[in-house]
Amino acid sequence: MENKLRSAAAIAAQTGLEADQLKDWLETPPDPAMGDYAFPCFRLAKSMRKAPPAIAAELAGSIGHIDGIASMEAKGGYLNFFADKTAFVRDTLNKVLAQGDSYGDSDLGGGRNVCVEYSSINIAKPFHIGHLPSTAIGNSLYRIYKALGYNAIGINHLGDWGTQFGKMIVAYKKWGDKPVPQCTVRELVKLYVRFHEEAEAHPEMNDEARAWFKKIENGDKEAVTLWQQFKDLTLKEVGKVYDRLGVRFDSYAGESFYEDKMGAVIDELREKGLLTVDKGATLVDLSAYDMPPCIILRSDGATLYATRDLAAAIYRKKTYDFVKSLYVVAYQQNLHFKQFFKVLELMGNDWVKDCEHVNFGMVSMEEGTLSTRHGNVVYLEDVLDAAVEKTGKIIEEKSPDLPDKDEVAAAVGVGAVVWSMLYNSRIKDVTFSWKKVLNFDGETGPYAQYTHARCCSVLRKAGVYDVNAMDASCFSDDATASLAKAIAAFPAAVLAAAEKNEPYIVSRATMEVCTAFNKFYFCNQIITEDAGVSAARLALTDAARITIKKGLYLVGLQAPERM
C-alpha cells in the first residue's frame, strides 16, 4: 500500500491532480511481468489532450526516483511500476510481525455500533442446512466488523411467535408421549409434520390451533408454559450446534419480544396518515414506489412480519444507536425489505439509510428443496457429524500418530462445511452436495487449515529465530515476492469485505496467501546452514502463519497447529 501511495504521489506531482484520486486509478496488472502497479494513462488523455502512450512515456521520463520502486516502464497506454522486491518483502513482514495477531485489524469503527441480524432460527423447527448461509455469513461479518474497531452486536431474531405454536401444542397434546423437556427437537418436528398431514383431512384442526395460539397471546398458563418449554428445548439444542460453529450472539430478542412494542408503531403510522384499509386489511400504500402494499394488520387484526420488523428496527436504533444495521436474510425476502425500509423512510426515520439487507442465495438439496411441513430436511448437525467423521478417517489414514486427532477432525470437518458457504459471493445459490462439501482438495477450508499447520510445523522444527539477523538479500525471487504481495493485500481485503458485506473476499485473500506460501515452500529451502537466510525465510513463514490464522478466524474457522 505504501508503494501505491508513493507512486500516486509521484504522478500527482507531475499532473497537479490529487494523489488520493490517482491511487484509486492504479491497477494491479494480470501478469506480474507487467509490473506491480499500472497507471492507465487514458484517464488523463482528455485533460492533457494527448494520446495515452505519449502520456505514459512523458511520465516515465519526468518522474524521478520513488522509494520502494525499483523501476518504471511505459508500455502502450500504461505506466508500469516495479517494486523493489527486497525492500517490499522486508517492510511487509516487519509490519506483520510487529502487529502480530492484530494484523488486518483497524480502528476504523471507533467503537461505534453495528447490528448484525443473522441465523434467526424458528423455535421447534429443524436447524437445517438452509440456515447455514445466514449463520456463517453473519458470524463472519460480526467478526470482521469487530476487527475493524466497531462494536458489533449479534442478533438472533428468533421465530418464536405465531399460529405455528398453536399447531405445535395441538400436535403435542394429541400425540406427545413424554414431558417436553425430555423430547428432542426432531421429535417435535415429527409431531408438526404429522399435524399438517392430519389437518389436510381434518381442517378443523387449524381452528383448534388458532384457539391455542390465542391462549398464548392471552397469557393462559398451560399454553404459555408449553410455548416456553418448546423455546427452551430448541435453544438448548441449537446452542450446541452454535458452539461447534464458534457462533455467538449478544441478543436473542425475537418476534415475541416485540409483541408489546408494535402498538406504538401502528399508532405512529396512523398519526402520520400512512395507513389505509383495503378489504379489511390495514396497510401502507406503496404504489407510488412501484411496490405492492406493505400489510401492517390482517383483516383479523393479526400482525405480520413487517409490523414486527418495524418495531424491531425502531427499538434497535433507540437501544444501540447503530451506524449500520444489517439483516442477513435470503434474497427471497428482497421485496419485504424494500417495503419495510420504505415504510421506515416514510415515517421520517432518516437513519434507514444505515439499514441494509445482506441477501444471499438459497441452499437446495440435489434431490429437492427443504421443507419442514413434509419432513424433507437435512439437519445441520448431521452435516457437521458426517464431515467430522470423514475427516477423522482421513487423519487416521494419513497421520495415525497425530495428537488430539478428535479435536483436529472437529475443527477441520466443521471448517470444511463453513468454508463451502463463504468461498463465493453470497448471492450465488448453493446446491448442497455431500461430494462438494466433503471434498478436501483444491481451494477448500481444510487446504487453508493444512497450510497454517505447515507454517507451524516449519517454525516448530526451527525453534527460536532472530528476526534481527535476517539476510534480506534472499527476498529477491518471484515466489518470495508473490507471498509478500498476498500478505500485504490482506488488510485491504478485510476492509473491502466490510464495505461490501462479502466475507468471501477474506476467504479468497486467505487462499491467495496459502497458495503463495506453498509455492514459496517448494521453491525455497527455509531452514538452511546460513543463519541469516534461515531467519529471513522463517520470518516470512511466521508472517504467512499470522495472516492465514487471522483469515481463518474472520470467516469462522479454527486454525489447527498440527494436521
Predicted region positions:
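Non-catalytic interaction-recognition regions
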Residues: 1-90, 98-563
